From Swiss-Prot:
Part of an ATP-binding cassette (ABC) transport system involved in metal import. Binds a metal with high affinity and specificity and delivers it to the membrane permease for translocation into the cytoplasm. Part of an ATP-driven transport system for manganese. Does not exhibit adhesion properties. CDD domains: PsaA (cd01137). Keywords: Cell membrane, Lipoprotein, Manganese, Membrane, Metal-binding, Palmitate, Plasmid, Signal, Transport. It is found in: Cell membrane. Coiled coil: none annotated. The keyword Transferase does not apply. This is Metal ABC transporter substrate-binding lipoprotein ScbA. InterPro entries: AdhesinB (IPR006129), Bact_metal-bind_prot9 (IPR050492), Lipoprotein_PsaA-like (IPR006128), ZnuA-like (IPR006127). GO terms for cellular component: plasma membrane. SUPFAM superfamilies: Helical backbone' metal receptor. A lipid is attached at C20 (S-diacylglycerol cysteine).
Amino acid sequence: MKKCRFLVLLLLAFVGLAACSSQKSSTETGSSKLNVVATNSIIADITKNIAGDKINLHSIVPVGQDPHEYEPLPEDVKKTSQADLIFYNGINLETGGNAWFTKLVENAKKKENKDYYAVSEGVDVIYLEGQSEKGKEDPHAWLNLENGIIYAQNIAKRLSEKDPANKETYEKNLKAYVEKLSALDKEAKEKFNNIPGEKKMIVTSEGCFKYFSKAYNVPSAYIWEINTEEEGTPDQIKTLVEKLRKTKVPSLFVESSVDDRPMKTVSKDTNIPIYAKIFTDSVAEKGEEGDSYYSMMKYNLEKIAEGLSK
């Protein structure tokens, strides 16, 4: 059913494109700005920090929605077709699940490493462990700030290649942004070093904090491993509850983009409170705390450190 709906949306969008053939890529129209598409709000924000007002930027997956499985709207199809440059996460995020991004770029006749690029290129990939997804890549690399820096470097490189006239601006913005992220990363490592070992475990609904765990030496536990599998089954909850009863973990966390009911059940069964909602697959709405990649990571780091220090 999803596939049929997706194809209908594609057809409608391309009909609209045919009727508006004057709206093309910046190269074809002579526009001074690149048309750039990012698959989600995190990648879009990093891109914005590098490019500023030098590009026209469209983000596909709306704030607060799950990028693992998404159904592009006609506007997304149109923007993708017109794009000079497309940034996606890769490593099993948009190309896993219902493979919505693969279908989108194929229908837009875009080519990998010419029109669209994975911003995660160069990341030290961590793999999933559960039976249903074992051996597949864990996509949540951005939850390690060092990987966020790699994302920014890849974005700046591709922008400079496509738009050499603004290369100096992109490189200057990259330098300032990397310094900002590096300072936060250093602060986080110092903060987590001071938390007692028996309290040091981040417990979330989705098992998306493996990169975070490795970077900041904080073991992780979860109800389900990735959002493309079953979420919050009785067996999943039971397994986590049994694990937590053997620990001294003081706080639980729930992600802003998932149903919080399974974690509430875990909290009730273990008598461990949910300390805070944290961000994983999306930034917050504009004007709210966590509405950029930097501020969402700063918020996460502060809340997790506070919760584990209880």
